[in-house]
A protein has these predicted regions:
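N-terminal beta1-alpha1-beta2 module of alpha/beta enzyme domains
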Residues: 1-77
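Flexible, glycine-rich active-site loops centered on histidine and acidic residues
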Residues: 2-23, 84-107
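Acidic, glycine-rich active-site loops and adjacent beta-strand->loop/helix elements
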Residues: 50-53, 80-89
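A short, GP-enriched loop/loop-strand-helix hinge that lies immediately N-terminal to
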Residues: 75-81, 107
Length: 107
Protein backbone atom coordinates (compact mmCIF):
# COMPACT_ATOMS: atom_id res chain seq x y z
CA UNK A 1 0.00 0.00 0.00
CA UNK A 2 1.12 3.54 -0.75
CA UNK A 3 0.14 6.69 1.07
CA UNK A 4 0.41 10.21 -0.24
CA UNK A 5 -0.89 13.75 -0.36
CA UNK A 6 -2.96 15.25 -3.17
CA UNK A 7 -3.73 18.92 -3.67
CA UNK A 8 -5.86 20.39 -6.40
CA UNK A 9 -4.41 23.83 -5.71
CA UNK A 10 -7.71 25.35 -4.73
CA UNK A 11 -7.88 28.85 -3.33
CA UNK A 12 -9.92 28.18 -0.23
CA UNK A 13 -11.77 30.86 1.65
CA UNK A 14 -10.47 31.94 5.02
CA UNK A 15 -13.06 30.73 7.53
CA UNK A 16 -12.67 33.88 9.63
CA UNK A 17 -12.80 36.55 6.91
CA UNK A 18 -14.54 34.78 4.02
CA UNK A 19 -11.85 36.03 1.62
CA UNK A 20 -9.95 33.70 -0.67
CA UNK A 21 -6.38 32.94 0.26
CA UNK A 22 -3.78 34.65 -1.90
CA UNK A 23 -2.08 32.29 -4.37
CA UNK A 24 1.37 33.02 -2.89
CA UNK A 25 0.17 32.06 0.60
CA UNK A 26 -1.64 28.95 -0.61
CA UNK A 27 1.44 27.85 -2.59
CA UNK A 28 3.60 28.14 0.53
CA UNK A 29 1.03 26.13 2.49
CA UNK A 30 0.87 23.34 -0.11
CA UNK A 31 4.66 23.16 -0.45
CA UNK A 32 4.78 22.88 3.33
CA UNK A 33 2.42 19.89 3.16
CA UNK A 34 4.75 18.25 0.64
CA UNK A 35 7.79 18.82 2.85
CA UNK A 36 5.97 17.40 5.87
CA UNK A 37 4.78 14.40 3.85
CA UNK A 38 8.39 13.76 2.78
CA UNK A 39 9.65 14.05 6.36
CA UNK A 40 6.96 11.64 7.57
CA UNK A 41 7.91 9.05 4.95
CA UNK A 42 4.81 9.24 2.77
CA UNK A 43 5.18 7.81 -0.72
CA UNK A 44 3.82 10.36 -3.17
CA UNK A 45 2.83 14.01 -3.57
CA UNK A 46 0.40 14.93 -6.35
CA UNK A 47 -0.79 18.30 -7.63
CA UNK A 48 -3.65 18.95 -10.04
CA UNK A 49 -3.80 21.20 -13.10
CA UNK A 50 -6.60 23.76 -13.31
CA UNK A 51 -7.32 26.88 -15.32
CA UNK A 52 -9.87 28.92 -13.39
CA UNK A 53 -10.02 31.63 -10.74
CA UNK A 54 -10.70 29.12 -7.94
CA UNK A 55 -7.36 27.34 -8.48
CA UNK A 56 -3.78 28.52 -8.90
CA UNK A 57 -2.04 25.41 -10.23
CA UNK A 58 -2.05 25.83 -13.99
CA UNK A 59 1.37 24.17 -14.35
CA UNK A 60 1.86 21.03 -12.24
CA UNK A 61 5.43 20.49 -13.49
CA UNK A 62 6.49 23.91 -12.16
CA UNK A 63 4.87 23.31 -8.76
CA UNK A 64 6.42 19.84 -8.60
CA UNK A 65 9.85 21.26 -9.50
CA UNK A 66 9.53 23.63 -6.53
CA UNK A 67 8.52 20.62 -4.45
CA UNK A 68 11.54 18.64 -5.68
CA UNK A 69 13.84 21.42 -4.51
CA UNK A 70 12.39 21.17 -0.99
CA UNK A 71 12.10 17.38 -0.61
CA UNK A 72 14.44 14.40 -0.78
CA UNK A 73 12.51 11.17 -1.19
CA UNK A 74 8.81 11.55 -1.93
CA UNK A 75 7.69 10.73 -5.49
CA UNK A 76 6.10 13.56 -7.49
CA UNK A 77 3.15 13.29 -9.86
CA UNK A 78 0.38 15.24 -11.53
CA UNK A 79 -3.09 14.38 -10.27
CA UNK A 80 -4.60 15.88 -13.43
CA UNK A 81 -3.02 16.92 -16.71
CA UNK A 82 -5.40 18.52 -19.19
CA UNK A 83 -4.34 17.10 -22.53
CA UNK A 84 -6.67 19.38 -24.46
CA UNK A 85 -4.90 22.47 -23.13
CA UNK A 86 -1.24 21.54 -23.63
CA UNK A 87 0.87 20.05 -26.39
CA UNK A 88 1.51 16.39 -25.42
CA UNK A 89 5.17 16.65 -26.44
CA UNK A 90 5.59 19.68 -24.19
CA UNK A 91 3.97 17.85 -21.26
CA UNK A 92 6.37 14.94 -21.82
CA UNK A 93 9.37 17.27 -21.99
CA UNK A 94 8.32 19.17 -18.86
CA UNK A 95 7.96 15.94 -16.87
CA UNK A 96 11.19 14.52 -18.31
CA UNK A 97 12.95 17.68 -17.06
CA UNK A 98 11.20 17.33 -13.70
CA UNK A 99 12.44 13.75 -13.50
CA UNK A 100 16.03 14.98 -13.95
CA UNK A 101 15.60 17.82 -11.44
CA UNK A 102 14.06 15.45 -8.88
CA UNK A 103 16.66 12.72 -9.48
CA UNK A 104 14.15 10.20 -10.79
CA UNK A 105 11.19 10.94 -8.53
CA UNK A 106 8.75 12.19 -11.20
CA UNK A 107 5.88 9.95 -12.24
Amino acid sequence: MELGVLSLGDLQRDQRTGRRHRPVDRMAEILGYAVLADQLGLDVFAIGEHHSAEFFTSSPAVVLAATAARTARIRLTSATTLRGVADPVRVYEDFASLDVISRGRAE
